């Protein structure tokens, strides 16, 4: 964990990307079920 000089660890990139993708899909489905999907 100490050799992260100037480079983001791959597991952090994967975790953040996964959270963003899951959050985006969740917001999309929530908006479509709430009737707000057309405004997104």
From Swiss-Prot:
Subunit structure comment from the entry: PSII is composed of 1 copy each of membrane proteins PsbA, PsbB, PsbC, PsbD, PsbE, PsbF, PsbH, PsbI, PsbJ, PsbK, PsbL, PsbM, PsbT, PsbX, PsbY, PsbZ, Psb30/Ycf12, at least 3 peripheral proteins of the oxygen-evolving complex and a large number of cofactors. It forms dimeric complexes.
Organism domain of life: Eukaryota
Main location: plastid
Protein's recorded name: Photosystem II reaction center protein J
Gene Ontology BP, a term: photosynthesis
Family, similarity comment: Belongs to the PsbJ family.
Bilayer-crossing regions: 8-28
Function: One of the components of the core complex of photosystem II (PSII). PSII is a light-driven water:plastoquinone oxidoreductase that uses light energy to abstract electrons from H(2)O, generating O(2) and a proton gradient subsequently used for ATP formation. It consists of a core antenna complex that captures photons, and an electron transfer chain that converts photonic excitation into a charge separation.
GO CC annotations, alphabetized: chloroplast thylakoid membrane; photosystem II reaction center
Membrane-topology descriptor: Single-pass membrane protein
The species this protein was found in: Coffea arabica (Arabian coffee)
Keywords linked to the UniProt accession: Chloroplast, Membrane, Photosynthesis, Photosystem II, Plastid, Reaction center, Thylakoid, Transmembrane, Transmembrane helix
Location of the protein in the cell: Plastid, Chloroplast thylakoid membrane
